[in-house]
């Protein structure tokens, strides 16, 4: 309501109001009429609506002629009001239908009665209740008068995106809606505000969206936004897709495994780091094929994403591409070697797209494409990605080919004005590596010396940047590429620090002369072209005909390289190609090996304090001419090993010391062709003016001068501050040199003495690489990980004819011989040799498969070298990088592992687990359980760590995935499974295509021909997959089987060498998915495939019966849980061990099958188990394959001698090398061996994974093997010997379980122990009582030791207790029963000889183990044990139980029995009970307990006095009295046997019988005690089992309780609702009453009114009465008035 002249008027009166309000004097005017507003039925309420507006408004507001479609700022109140009061235009402006997701900036006018404008397709922030949109309402004033109403909402995805609706208070139907994304730069304080602000939303919101939906939402929001992530000089383009990708990464519900905490850098810290997609380590191998696109912008260059804005075409004068080209339909050279590859568009460096609408200029400062973090970025040059030539790009050295048009290109570099032509149309200046659209040329334009683009090596530009003489006005150029931590951690470049960048390239003008004269600058003087191959068409290798590297006047002492060429077929050799570029990106087939090229290398000038580091650049030289390297003896330059002869491609490893005088001349003597010499600089940051001699022993100190922590100036080629470099390398002249100063080129050249570095031959005679769409596979073969100071670039290409080591003339020798140097990496069987700088900085390994080159040098063995030198190998890759805390996940680790023995182990945070070599270069282990967090992972050989450490992550489960939700885990809809199967197969096909491609490259390399790669590998299979996906019926399985068989037939699987880091569906492999779907045929096909290509890593990962998913479920677990009988049987028969692997809740497959009602399945598997055990029992009696005895010189024994802590091996411990082929594991099994020796302090690893002893078949064989090793008797092993010896759990006792208290469980038998490199006691059959091994336990000097827990404090917390799964059906009584039954039903007592031997050894052991105080003559028992204190009756009762038990259990043999036993020969039948495995009495294979060894007894006895033993278990221990009694018995037995041993028994039969009888009673007492000991162990195991069972039971109980709680809540809610219903009933009653009352009132009023009316009618004709009053009362009567 508006007040006019003291009267209140209706706000929007719909009727014509009489014109009693005049504009002249009033505050409010009747404004223009509004067009009629129709109601819903289309009826116009009236002709026009008059609106009263404040007069002030009309005076101050102009009328608007038009409503802008877009405005990228908020309107002022005055502007809004002006639009809203321009009524006459509204009809023209109104939008009649709601727009879906209007773009950022849109301004739209709606009529709210006709259009539901709020349904605009965006997702707006909701209130806490989640139902209504969160709106802010406010009234806005214009000229102090409130006249506008505003309603604001903001996006729930990007909080900076708003929708604001405005309307006039007087005319609320017309609404002006404005959409705007307001990057709050002032809030963020960062130039990259919009993105930073955008990401602070909650994860829940993101979880709802797919990537496509997000892009749909975000594209319009970011329309027209120009982000400048700039530090003043530069800005960089950005796209919505990248933002979405980054947001999804930052909000992933299950984050990808991260190998480290990310430190994304760039010069701007947060600004550039936002877009860092950091799970790149995972995708190192399979790189996406990126099509470089052309672009020819004049003024700007853009690096944009593929589809940033669809359909917006800006006219551009340099357009040379069409959309088809952009989308990759036109094949172009893809010369990208990605270090990190994501299948989504990570690392795509794309040349600008001319059809892009909003150009963003880029400059040398930053990556323009946020996903390019791993790739060198375009430095100050426009659409040509020329960084690759601009300065030794160490980051995965990419050569970018782009198409050059004739347009001029501008640099945005800070040193030049925006219009400075870096590459002018005639290519007269600057340096650009480009491919022109027609002729694919490498152009090296000539440069003037003054304004040329100087290519400074890193340390030079550092000196330029940081030296005091630097020209004050010059802007320090930013780093040319972003630092990628993944790349750094896994592939650090030479001398790189964490956070350092790559080379800088800058426009160097003449005033560089003022900087210290330390650089070598290279200028190219002319241009030459020839062809390189790409795909099937070859593009020519182009090169400067005569490219003289001329040093600019700046360098007093800079060397100038002159590159002259007589012919036309030179190699492209821009100064910036880094080592990997040389081989990976170039096609050498076009090299004409008969032309002569001359090149002179001369050093011009000298300076006393220069440390020269040549930048990595090539120069070509003539083979026949000497190449003089002159060194000024007065200068401190060290050009050691400046040039070497290399028949085809050369590397020059030049390392420098701070002072090295001497004249070195190196001659080239060679007959062959082209030499590509590479200056491989090491860019060690020298101290500022170079005067300092580097005496430091840590690289860090030298670098700190230049690397100021605050500013991430990426100095040179990234210094790598590495703690491991201990010590400096001294040069020949005695001057210390940091290890990182030693730079090796393409070869592992170690340089302990720097007089000259030796070199390796790199022969590329038959080396042909074609660039096809399979390019990445080629690169796979070249992937090499560089580490640390003194890095060696590990590409080793050796061919037979050129394997001579050329020696520099001053005779400095390389520290390694030719044979050591030439280990080819081509065949996986041979170790890549790894050398490192003399003091042992880590170096590099790479597998290279070039030609099938084989060298005898491999015999030397990489590991042999390593053992002697004590150096460290690099882990080149490992997958996966993470696990949940339960562990058990299979981890594959690649590196130079070659020894085919089982002596490898992996250390996860010092927890050792055994590893096995599944093929040369690939180790497999299963990670142990561990707390969450990052841990180090290292490889050990013979318990000595031989690898660098990499980071492995244990992740906590996100709350929704905690094990309680696992009750729903083992169920999924079929479609999801099927889709996943197809996805996995597609991944494998992609791998196959890559591998096929790379193999074709390799085959083609033999002839040096065209080498066209073929990507057709995957075609057929994919078609199959597609059709499979189409018909997801019963034939789905058969279709998948067909696909698998097709893939299986390809040979490439055998050659797969690299780990795949594919994203799995919930951690499930192909085998998991097949099992979950019950596809038995598919499973059999996969098994065939796996056996056919046993070495394939891909299949190792995809098809492994013991691998577990994210909830520790094996494929067998899935099959059991979902009731697939056939699949379960196939899986069980393939690998039985899977049946004992529990899931993360500790449930076993059979248990789950039962609980889910698949009883038949459970029974079937149990039946299979029983059958097997019965067969094993019989088989083990008969077959005992004898095994050979090893020679004492076996390396295992040697190692044993070294590893023992005392120098000599204790008596009786012999090392057995495993010569038995049975001991070589089949591929599908995880490694069976735990190495205990050396890791005693580490917690035991998770046991249920590597379950050696559940695999009984092999075990029985091993047992036999072990039994056949003869040894007359076991020597005493003194309990006092400090040598720890492993405890062997006897195969029959313990039913293949793990004893939890002992050290990490040891292998099942002596023979397998031998292969696990442990000391082993040889057994003879006599030492076995019913086939149980003697058990050794660590003794301690007093002889009263108990087995030390392996770091007791650590074992228990680290391990889940769900491990003792095999024992879950056994109860102690069964063993008692079995024992009693067996002893009662034995027809024949043991032959006396064996009783003698057993009792003798038993007595010996007992006497040996008895504590000294009990042996003393004046024996006084200790204060009674806790047990006796509490209940003295217990012991006596146990003793009486013992007595009665002995009476029942065994009838003593009569003399006749004894006589027959002595007279009869040992027949097999009488000896049956002695057979090693015993008779299969019980299904669980419980045997009569063993006669424990001395060490066992000492454990048992000392447990009696141990205070730690719980009182319940104390009943199982012996009191002092019992111990004394036992000791006396043992002595008696000993003396009796000694007395009667040698005499003829016939004479003294009677006497002997009596003595033996007496001893036998004692002996049985002893066996009972042995039994008691076994029971003691069993009970502890049972306790552990009960505990684990209780845990899973408790989990279930909790789950049920939560269900109950939910039900209760539901009930409460229902009853509450009912109450609620009752209340409204009451309310209605009240309302009815009130209505009645009011109706009574109105009746009374009516009556009164009628009376008045009657009176008035009577008076109608009276002149006194006013007729108007009468009319009014009439209206009142009709109810129209009040």
UniProtKB/Swiss-Prot annotation:
Residues 1308-1318 have a biased composition (Low complexity). GO terms for cellular component: cytoplasm; nucleus. One of its GO terms (molecular function) is sequence-specific DNA binding. ANK repeats lie at residues 1066-1095, 1111-1141, 1145-1174. Residues 337-367, 599-618, 1268-1291 have a biased composition (Polar residues). Residues 284-375, 599-622, 992-1020, 1217-1249, 1267-1318 are annotated as: Disordered. It is found in: Nucleus; Cytoplasm. It comes from the Eukaryota. CDD domains: IQCD. Residues 63-188 bind DNA. Residues 1549-1585, 1586-1608, 1609-1631 form the IQ domain. Signal peptide: none annotated. Residues 1005-1020 have a biased composition (Gly residues). One of its GO terms (biological process) is positive regulation of transcription by RNA polymerase II. Residues 877-955 form the IPT/TIG domain. Keywords: Activator, ANK repeat, Cytoplasm, Nucleus, Repeat, Transcription, Transcription regulation. Transcriptional activator. PANTHER family: CALMODULIN-BINDING TRANSCRIPTION ACTIVATOR 1, CALMODULIN-BINDING TRANSCRIPTION ACTIVATOR CAMTA. This is Calmodulin-binding transcription activator 1. It comes from Mus musculus. The gene is Camta1.
């Amino acid at each position: 309501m508006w007040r006019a002249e003291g009267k209140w008027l209706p706000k929007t009166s719909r009727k014509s109001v009489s014109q009693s309000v005049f504009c002249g004097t009033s505050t409010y005017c009747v404004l223009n009429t509004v067009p009629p507003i129709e109601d819903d039925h289309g009826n116009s309420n009236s002709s026009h609506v008059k609106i009263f507006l404040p007069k002030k408004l009309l005076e101050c507001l102009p009328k608007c002629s038009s409503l802008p479609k877009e405005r990228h700022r908020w309107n002022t109140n005055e502007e809004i009001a002006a639009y809203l009061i321009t009524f006459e235009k509204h009809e023209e402006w109104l939008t009649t239908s709601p727009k879906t997701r209007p773009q950022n900036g849109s301004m739209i006018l709606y009529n709210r009665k006709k259009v539901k404008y709020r349904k605009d397709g965006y997702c707006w922030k909701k209130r806490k209740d989640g139902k209504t949109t969160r709106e802010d309402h406010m009234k806005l004033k214009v000229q102090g008068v409130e006249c506008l109403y505003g309603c604001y909402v903001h996006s729930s995805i990007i909080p900076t995106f708003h929708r604001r609706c405005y309307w006039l208070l007087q005319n609320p139907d017309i609404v002006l809606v404005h959409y705007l994304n307001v990057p709050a730069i002032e809030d963020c304080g960062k130039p990259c505000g919009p993105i930073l602000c955008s990401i602070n939303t909650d994860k829940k919101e993101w979880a709802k969206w797919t990537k496509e939906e997000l892009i749909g939402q975000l594209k319009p929001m970011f329309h027209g936004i120009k982000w400048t992530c700039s530090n003043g000089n530069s800005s960089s383009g950005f796209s919505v897709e990248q933002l979405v990708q980054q947001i999804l990464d930052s909000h992933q519900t299950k984050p990808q495994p991260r190998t480290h905490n990310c430190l994304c850098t760039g010069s701007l810290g947060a600004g550039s780091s936002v877009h860092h997609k950091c799970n790149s380590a995972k995708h190192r191998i399979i790189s996406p094929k990126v099509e470089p696109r052309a672009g020819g912008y004049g003024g700007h260059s853009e690096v944009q994403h593929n589809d940033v804005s669809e359909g917006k075409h800006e006219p551009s004068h340099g357009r040379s591409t069409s959309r088809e080209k952009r989308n990759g339909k036109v094949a172009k050279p893809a010369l990208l070697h990605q270090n990190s590859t994501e299948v989504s568009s990570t690392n795509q460096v794309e040349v600008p797209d001319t059809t892009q609408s909003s150009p963003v200029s880029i400059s040398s400062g930053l990556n323009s494409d946020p996903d390019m973090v791993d790739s060198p970025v375009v430095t100050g040059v426009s659409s040509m990605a020329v960084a690759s030539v601009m300065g030794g790009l160490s980051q995965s050295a990419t050569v970018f080919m782009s198409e050059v048009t004739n347009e001029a290109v501008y640099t945005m570099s800070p040193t030049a004005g925006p219009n400075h032509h870096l590459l002018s149309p005639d290519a007269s200046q600057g340096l650009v590596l480009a491919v022109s659209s027609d002729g694919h040329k490498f152009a090296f334009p000539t440069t003037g010396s003054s304004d040329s683009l100087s290519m400074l090596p890193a340390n030079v530009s550092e000196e330029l940047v940081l030296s005091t003489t630097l020209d004050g006005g010059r802007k320090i150029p930013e780093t040319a590429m972003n630092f990628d931590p993944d790349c750094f951690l896994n592939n650090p470049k030479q001398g790189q620090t964490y956070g350092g960048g790559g080379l800088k390239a800058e426009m160097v003008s003449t005033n560089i002369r003022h900087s210290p004269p330390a650089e070598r600058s290279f200028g190219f003087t002319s241009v030459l072209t020839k062809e390189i191959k790409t795909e099937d068409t070859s593009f020519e290798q182009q090169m400067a005909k005569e490219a003289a590297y001329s040093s600019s006047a700046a360098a007093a002492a800079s060397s100038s390289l002159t590159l002259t060429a007589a012919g036309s077929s030179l190699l492209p050799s821009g100064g910036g190609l880094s080592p990997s570029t040389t081989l990976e990106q170039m096609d050498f087939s076009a090299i004409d090996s008969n032309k002569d090229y001359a090149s002179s290398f001369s050093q011009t000038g000298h300076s006393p304090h220069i440390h020269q580091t040549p930048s990595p650049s090539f120069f070509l030289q003539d083979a026949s001419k000497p190449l003089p390297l002159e060194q000024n003896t007065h200068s401190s330059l060290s050009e050691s090993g400046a040039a070497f002869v290399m028949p085809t491609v050369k590397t020059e490893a030049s390392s420098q010391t701070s002072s090295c005088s001497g004249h070195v001349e190196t001659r080239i003597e060679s007959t062959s062709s082209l030499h590509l010499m590479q200056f491989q600089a090491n860019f060690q940051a020298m101290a500022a003016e170079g005067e300092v001699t580097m005496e430091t022993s840590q690289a860090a100190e030298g670098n700190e001068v230049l690397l100021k922590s605050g500013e991430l100036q990426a100095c040179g080629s990234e210094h790598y501050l590495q703690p491991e470099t201990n010590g400096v390398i001294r040069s020949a002249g005695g001057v210390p040199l940091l290890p990182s100063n030693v730079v090796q080129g393409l070869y592992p050249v170690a340089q302990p003495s720097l007089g000259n570095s030796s070199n390796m031959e790199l022969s590329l005679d038959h080396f042909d690489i074609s660039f096809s769409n399979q390019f990445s596979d080629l690169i796979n073969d070249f992937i090499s990980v560089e580490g640390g100071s003194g890095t060696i670039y590990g590409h080793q290409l050796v061919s037979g004819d050129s394997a001579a080591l050329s020696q520099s003339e001053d005779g400095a020798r390389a520290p390694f011989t030719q044979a050591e140097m030439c280990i080819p990496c081509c065949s996986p069987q041979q170790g890549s040799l790894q050398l490192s700088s003399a003091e042992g900085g880590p170096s590099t390994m790479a597998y290279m498969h070039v030609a099938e080159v084989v060298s005898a040098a491999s015999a030397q063995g990489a590991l042999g070298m390593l053992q002697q030198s004590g150096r460290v190998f690099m882990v080149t890759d490992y997958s996966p990088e993470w696990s949940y805390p339960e562990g058990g996940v299979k981890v594959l680790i690649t590196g130079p592992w070659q020894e085919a023995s089982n002596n490898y182990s992996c250390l996860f945070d010092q927890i050792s687990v055994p590893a096995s070599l599944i093929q040369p270069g690939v180790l497999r282990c299963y990670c142990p359980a561990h707390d969450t967090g990052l841990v180090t992972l290292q490889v050990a050989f013979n318990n000595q760590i031989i690898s660098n450490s990499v980071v492995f992550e244990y992740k906590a489960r996100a709350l929704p995935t905690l094990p309680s939700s696992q009750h729903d885990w083992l169920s999924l809809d079929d479609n999801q499974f099927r889709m996943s199967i197809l996805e996995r197969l597609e991944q494998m096909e992609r791998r196959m295509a890559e591998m096929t491609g790379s193999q074709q490259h390799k085959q083609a390399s033999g002839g040096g021909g065209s080498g066209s790669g073929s990507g057709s590998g995957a075609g057929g299979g994919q078609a199959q997959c597609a059709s499979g996906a189409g018909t997801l019926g019963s034939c789905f399985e058969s279709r998948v089987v067909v696909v698998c068989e097709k893939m299986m037939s390809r040979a490439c699987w055998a050659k797969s060498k690299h780990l795949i880091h594919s994203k799995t569906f919930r951690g499930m492999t192909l085998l998991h998915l097949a099992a979950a779907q019950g596809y038995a045929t598919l499973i059999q096909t996969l098994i065939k495939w796996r056996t056919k290509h046993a070495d394939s890593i891909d299949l190792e990962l995809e098809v492994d019966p013991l691998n577990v998913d994210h909830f520790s479920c094996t494929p067998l677990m899935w099959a059991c849980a979902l009731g697939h009988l056939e699949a379960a049987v196939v899986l069980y028969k393939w690998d039985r061990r899977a049946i004992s692997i529990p899931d993360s809740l500790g449930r076993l497959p059979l248990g789950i099958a039962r609980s889910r009602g698949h009883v038949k399945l459970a029974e079937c598997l149990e039946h299979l188990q029983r059958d097997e055990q019965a067969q094993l029992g019989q088989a083990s009696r008969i077959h005992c394959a004898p095994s050979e005895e090893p020679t004492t010189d076996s390396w295992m024994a040697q190692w044993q001698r070294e590893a023992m802590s005392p120098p000599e091996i204790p008596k009786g411990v012999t090392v057995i090398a495993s010569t038995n082929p049975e001991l070589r594991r089949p591929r599908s099994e995880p490694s069976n061996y735990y190495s205990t020796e050396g890791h005693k302090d580490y917690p035991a690893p998770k046991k249920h994974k590597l379950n050696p002893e559940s695999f009984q078949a092999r075990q029985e064989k091993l047992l036999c093997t072990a039994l056949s090793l003869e040894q007359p008797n076991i020597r005493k092993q003194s309990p006092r010997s400090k040598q720890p010896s492993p405890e062997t759990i006897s195969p029959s006792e313990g039913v293949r379980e793990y004893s939890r208290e002992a050290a990490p469980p040891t292998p099942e038998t002596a023979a397998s122990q031998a292969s696990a490199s442990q000391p082993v006691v040889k057994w003879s059959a006599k030492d076995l009582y019913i086939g149980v091994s003697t058990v050794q336990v660590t003794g301690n000097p007093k002889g009263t030791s108990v087995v030390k827990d392996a770091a007791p404090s650590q074992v228990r917390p680290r391990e889940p207790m769900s491990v003792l799964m095999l024992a879950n059906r056994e109860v102690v009584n069964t063993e008692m029963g079995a024992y009693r039954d067996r002893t009662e039903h034995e027809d024949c007592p043991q032959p006396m000889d064996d009783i003698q031997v057993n009792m003798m050894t038993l007595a010996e052991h007992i006497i040996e183990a008895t504590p000294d105080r009990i042996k003393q003559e004046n024996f006084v028992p200790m204060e009674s044990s806790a047990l006796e204190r509490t209940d003295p009756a217990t012991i006596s009762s146990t003793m009486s139980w013992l007595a009665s038990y002995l009476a029942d259990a065994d009838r003593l043999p009569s003399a006749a029995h004894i006589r027959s036993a002595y007279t009869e020969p040992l027949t097999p039948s009488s000896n049956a009970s002695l057979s090693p495995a015993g008779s299969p009495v019980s299904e669980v294979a419980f045997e009569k307990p063993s006669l424990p060894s001395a060490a066992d007894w000492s454990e048992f006895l000392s447990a009696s006095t141990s205070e730690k033993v719980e009182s319940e278990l104390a009943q199982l221990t012996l009191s002092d009295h019992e111990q004394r009694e036992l000791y006396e018995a043992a002595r008696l037995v000993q003396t009796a046997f000694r007395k009667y041993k040698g005499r003829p028994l016939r004479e003294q039969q009677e006497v002997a019988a009596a003595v033996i009888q007496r001893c036998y009673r004692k002996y049985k007492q002893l066996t009972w005690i042995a039994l008691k000991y076994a029971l003691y162990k069993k009970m502890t195991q049972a306790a552990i089992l009960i505990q684990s069972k209780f845990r899973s039971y408790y989990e279930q109980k909790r789950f049920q309780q939560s269900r109950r709680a939910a039900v209760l809540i539901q009930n409460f809610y229902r009853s509450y609702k009912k109450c609620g219903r009752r209340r409204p009933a009451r309310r209605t009653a009240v309302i009815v009453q009130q209505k009645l009352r009011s109706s009574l009132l109105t009746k009374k009023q009516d009556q009164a009114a009628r009376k008045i009316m009657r009176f008035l009618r009577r008076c109608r004709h009276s002149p006194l009465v006013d007729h108007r009053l009468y009319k009014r009362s009439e209206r009142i009567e009709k109810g129209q008035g009040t």
